Curated annotation (Swiss-Prot):
Alphabetically ordered keywords of this record: Glycoprotein, Membrane, Signal, Transmembrane, Transmembrane helix
Signal peptide: 1-28
Protein name, as recorded: Transmembrane 9 superfamily member 3
Taxonomic lineage of the native organism: Eukaryota, Metazoa, Chordata, Craniata, Vertebrata
Location (main, coarse): membrane
């Protein structure tokens, strides 16, 4: 084995450069959140959009609202995560100072012509509401309302702000919309506001607690689903262990007895079972380049999921705009050597020679899938003039991360994988000529095993899927990452158990095509998750329109595919260890 000081040095240098490049972007905090008396407090206007379509958002001033008179304000620097999530912070123009009350005052006037009235009427008909920020605390308000007959429409013109402070920090913000004014063409509408400062006992670190919903996320159903999944894991692990231990013990006893027979008795005997394919079970999988790239990508997705959940459990990422996405991008880039190591080593063990091509496919498989979907949805967002349209500069930044961070780190991982664990070390010799696969019952066919393999893993997570979907597609903040970690562990255990059982029955039917079968049977969980997303869309939401529908099903396809690749890699890795173990313990001539 050759030493790799150069590769290790490159890995260390690349990782250090990556940290310096991306780590500052993982925090959305531009300020210290401390103020002096009379110091300026900025009210940012974010986006406006229909209530039932959370992702269909537009710039606040795309509606004909007017801007306050205050003009001097420092520029806001958005993070990568904010840019990708469509955050569009614009200065409101309102003059607000720390601990300085503002009596009701007019800050601007709307000259309401027919075009502006129609824009407001459309927004009110579609239940538009807007989001604002003060000191990174979100505030929501509705644009207006219609009368019972739907003939007259009214605009809320008075923003009554109550801001709580504890010491020199802002800990609470409340908005009350008042001043309902009927929308009549060719009239002038005065927009006004007031600010009331109140001393609060809320601690700064607890100021986001009001936005959480413990009654929803810690409902008895949530606890029961976790308990139910945990009991299923215990039952499944016990069942698998009992079946395999008893069955394998009988198999080993039968094979040991066969070893004691002479050649004539062995020829007359009825040989069957998984031992018969010992010369083919470690044969390289079909399409090894794609297979190894999928395994490497799945291992990386698992590493990203594990690290991000741990970080979210330690840090309250939900308190900063875009921090979850920024952290995920940073961790994905940083874990690129994991992809290269597992994908490159597997490809080398399977005798692959085009390792550079495999490295490129492994590095860009997931980014290409995500960027391709985002590119398609971006066209629709541009057509709708939605804030979700990704700016060109952000696209360039993402491409730079892919080519100058992910690709070099993936190369380092591939080189390490090929040199450290790329040599075949199978317990059985691979025959030169493949063994014919005998006919078997229909339910032992790989296609049937693949379709059925994802049912139990999906059953262990589908309740958690509801809470995750609701937090993303509705107006809930997901914060119970301990639940998510437990569900991830349960999913891994169930997936490995199911794929081991499926692989055992496949090998016992003397079918040695277990690599793709183990991967796809675990990955089929994604099919059930995507099918569940259809149920959630039609029965749990009131989404409508081309943009929101495309956004929903496009990114749900990305999420389901990534989950499937991760489960497939987990299933294959567990099954590979199982197959190696059982053939190591069998005496082969």
């Amino acid at each position: 084995m050759r030493p790799l000081p150069g590769a290790l040095g490159v890995a260390a240098a690349a990782a250090l450069w990556l940290l310096l490049l991306l780590l500052p972007r993982t925090r959305a905090d531009e300020h210290e959140h401390t103020y002096q008396d009379k110091e300026e407090v900025v009210l940012w206007m974010n986006t406006v959009g229909p209530y039932h379509n959370r992702q269909e958002t537009y710039k606040y001033f795309s509606l004909p609202f007017c801007v306050g008179s205050k003009k001097s304000i420092s520029h806001y620097h958005e993070t990568l995560g904010e840019a990708l999530q469509g955050v569009e912070l614009e200065f409101s123009g309102l003059d607000i100072k720390f601990k300085d009350d503002v009596m009701p005052a007019t800050y601007c006037e709307i000259d309401l012509d027919k075009e502006k009235r129609d824009a407001f009427v459309y927004a009110i008909k579609n239940h538009y509401w807007y989001q604002m920020y003060i000191d990174d605390l979100p505030i929501w308000g509705i644009v207006g309302e219609a009368d019972e007959n739907g003939e007259d429409y009214y605009l809320w013109t008075y923003k009554k702000l109550e801001i709580g402070f504890n010491g020199n920090r802002i800990v609470d913000v409340n908005l009350t919309s008042e001043g309902k004014v009927k929308l009549v063409p060719n009239t002038k509408i005065q927009m006004s506001y007031s600010v009331k400062w109140k001393k609060s006992d809320v601690k700064f670190e607890d100021r986001f607690d009001k936005y959480l919903d413990p009654s929803f996320f810690q409902h008895r159903i949530h606890w029961f689903s976790i308990f139910n999944s945990f009991m299923m894991v215990i039952f499944l692990v016990g069942l698998v262990s009992m079946i395999l231990m008893r069955t394998l013990r009988k198999d080993y006893a039968r094979y040991s007895k066969e070893e004691e027979m002479d050649d004539m008795d062995r020829d007359l005997g009825d040989e069957y079972g998984w031992k018969q394919v010992h010369g083919d079970v470690f044969r390289p999988s079909s399409h090894p380049l794609i297979f190894s790239s999928l395994i490497g990508s799945g291992c990386q997705i698992f590493a990203v999921s594990l690290i991000v959940i741990i970080v979210a459990m330690i840090e309250d990422l939900y308190t900063e705009r875009g921090s979850m996405l920024s952290t995920a991008i940073f961790v994905y880039a940083a874990t690129s050597p994991v992809n290269g190591y597992f994908g490159g080593s597997l490809y080398a063990r399977q005798g692959g020679r085009r390792w550079i091509k495999q490295m490129f496919i492994g590095a860009f498989l997931i980014p290409a899938m995500v960027c391709g979907t985002a590119f398609f949805i971006n066209f629709i967002a541009i057509y709708y003039h939605a804030s979700r349209a990704i700016p060109f500069g952000t696209m360039v930044a993402v491409c730079c991360i892919c080519f100058f961070v992910i690709l070099p780190l993936n190369l380092v991982g591939t080189i390490l994988g090929r040199n450290l664990s790329g040599q075949p070390n199978f317990p059985c010799r691979v025959n030169a000529v493949p063994r014919p696969i005998p006919e078997k019952k229909w339910f032992m066919e790989p296609a049937v095993i693949v379709c059925l393999g994802g049912i139990l893993p999906f059953g262990s997570i589908f309740i958690e899927m509801y809470f995750i979907f609701t937090s993303f597609w509705a107006y809930k903040i997901y914060y119970v990452y301990g639940f998510m970690m437990l569900v991830l562990v349960i999913l891994c255990i169930v997936t490995v158990c199911v794929t081991i059982v499926c692989t055992y029955f496949l090998l016992n039917a003397e079918d040695y095509r277990w690599q793709w079968t183990s991967f796809l049977s675990a990955a089929s969980t994604a099919i059930y998750v995507y099918m569940y997303s259809f149920y959630y869309y039609f029965f749990k939401t009131k989404m409508y329109g081309l943009f929101q529908t495309s956004f929903y099903f496009g990114y749900m396809a990305v999420f389901s595919t990534a989950l499937g690749i991760m489960c497939g890699a987990i299933g294959y890795m567990g099954t590979s260890a199982f197959v190696r173990k059982i053939y190591t313990n069998v005496k082969i001539d």
